[in-house]
Amino acid sequence: MAVQTDIEIARAARKKPIQEIGAGLGIPAEALIPYGHDKAKVGQGFIRGLEGRPDGKLILVTAINPTPAGEGKTTTTVGLGDGLNRIGKKAVICIREASLGPNFGMKGGAAGGGRAQVVPMEDMNLHFTGDFHAITAAHNLLAAMIDNHIYWGNALELDARRITWRRVMDMNDRALRDTVVNLGGVANGFPRQTGFDITVASEVMAILCLADDLEDLERRLGRIVVGYRRDKSPVYCRDLKAAGAMAVLLKDAMQPNLVQTIENNPAFVHGGPFANIAHGCNSVIATRTALKLADYVVTEAGFGADLGAEKFFDIKCRLAGLKPSAAVVVATVRALKMNGGVAREDLGREDVAALRRGCANLGRHIANVKGFGVPVVVAINHFTTDTEAEIEAVRAYAAGQGAEAFLCRHWAEGSAGIEDLAQKVVELAEAPSMFAPLYPDDMPLFEKMETVARRIYHAHDVIADHVIRDQLRTWEEAGYGALPVCMAKTQYSFTTDAAIRGAPEGHSIPIREVRLAAGAGFVVAICGEIRTMPGLPSQPAAELIHLDEEGRIEGLF
């Protein structure tokens, strides 16, 4: 019998009406704004009424450094949420929305996989409720208003050479990284160099994911720095009178999306910043809403713990006042073997020696998460090529690092395959949280970057020229010194070289550029060759995506 694909499993799911899913959480039908029969937004009025309720336990799912195909972190997040519900706990899943870029590129969708999926999978991986389109429109409205302001006289005296606000689109398109706009003569404006980022790297995306409510959203939008005058003083979005119109475009997108898993458990899917080039977490408003409605909230942060978990702790939890109770580090035998030097085409063969070498990567992530005061458990996401000897080697290594490891078969078996992990997570979460961020607010910005590089990446030093250091000092003098930092670097390594696997020591982290996200509330350090507009691979997934003769989508994964 052929193994069903993710899309076939999702299509066969017996979904409940979304009002029934909401009712299970105590959300009345009138508080839901339906988008069809199987997804809805939760109204701001209902969310405001939750204030004062006690919070449930917050569980983070993170991972080791991934292989290019991903290691099933979202699948494990969904599976664990289902598993907690299976053992009698009231649990909600909180994950990010999918970007079209990786859907049509290499990584694929963001709805989980196998028997641990959020549905409707096809909608989620494509346009969903239109949030990303609204974010793109709001971002590009500001870009249009900048060029329009300059065209009509430039009363704010913006220096066209120092405009920092680029345009965005939700697609991988390297051809748009660097562009020249306003060509074609004086009727079109004044030519200048700029470029595009992917929507998930937009500061508007980060603002939507970190804002408390609509009032806070508009206030943060107004704080966006769009560029500088010749005297290097900043020009803000509010100076252009753009924040109100942007907030109008984002009004509906600000409301969390409620959907369900294949097992009919509730899931909030809202926001979608990448963790390699942004802060990598779903929205604060969705997480807080879930914490008021459930005893356990299972959320994920993008890529490995060096990126997603660090930003979850140091940016999201710091800014939102959240206290995680436990963390799950997802590992796969194949990724550990790759970290141990095995070529991608050989990952299906047993190689315990390489696996043990690669386990150093797992050990680094376990230690890093523990460094935030959060108890850790390891989930071994099972693949059919795993051997018993390899699985036991991972268990033994994790035990040596003070973390129990559980083999999880949620992809194939759903919640029945992850019960043991769910029980352990409940046990860990019952202890008082000792969570603390990595660095204090009052540490200088460059020292914060050095702290992340040395403590999390085990780098020897951080390389930044005097222009970058001077810029950071200028921002500190302007009152931005207390902001956390967001390190943008490759997800495949603790270094800035994607080819260096394992747990390297003593390397350097070069900072190529720094960007102030004053509205979101952090400073971005772009490290190595990472790009905020990805490109497509030589054989993009888009080549395999099509409609069949009945108009059904094929090829999504």
Curated annotation (Swiss-Prot):
What is the recorded name of this protein? Formate--tetrahydrofolate ligase
The GO molecular function terms of this record are:
ATP binding; formate-tetrahydrofolate ligase activity
Matching PROSITE patterns, A to Z?
FTHFS_1 (PS00721), FTHFS_2 (PS00722)
Question: Which SUPFAM superfamilies does the annotation name?
Answer: P-loop containing nucleoside triphosphate hydrolases
Q: Belongs to which family?
A: Belongs to the formate--tetrahydrofolate ligase family.
- Its top-level enzyme class, in one word, is ligase
Tell me the name of the encoding gene.
fhs
Q: Which residues bind ATP?
A: T67, P68, A69, G70, E71, G72, K73, T74
Q: Which CDD domains match?
A: FTHFS
Supply the InterPro entries for this chain.
Answer: Formate_THF_ligase, Formate_THF_ligase_CS, P-loop_NTPase
Q: What keywords would UniProt list here?
A: ATP-binding, Ligase, Nucleotide-binding, One-carbon metabolism
Q: Set out the biological process GO terms recorded for this chain's protein.
A: tetrahydrofolate interconversion
Catalytic activity from the UniProt record: (6S)-5,6,7,8-tetrahydrofolate + formate + ATP = (6R)-10-formyltetrahydrofolate + ADP + phosphate
Tell me its EC number(s), please. Answer: 6.3.4.3
Look up the record and name the pathway of this protein.
One-carbon metabolism; tetrahydrofolate interconversion
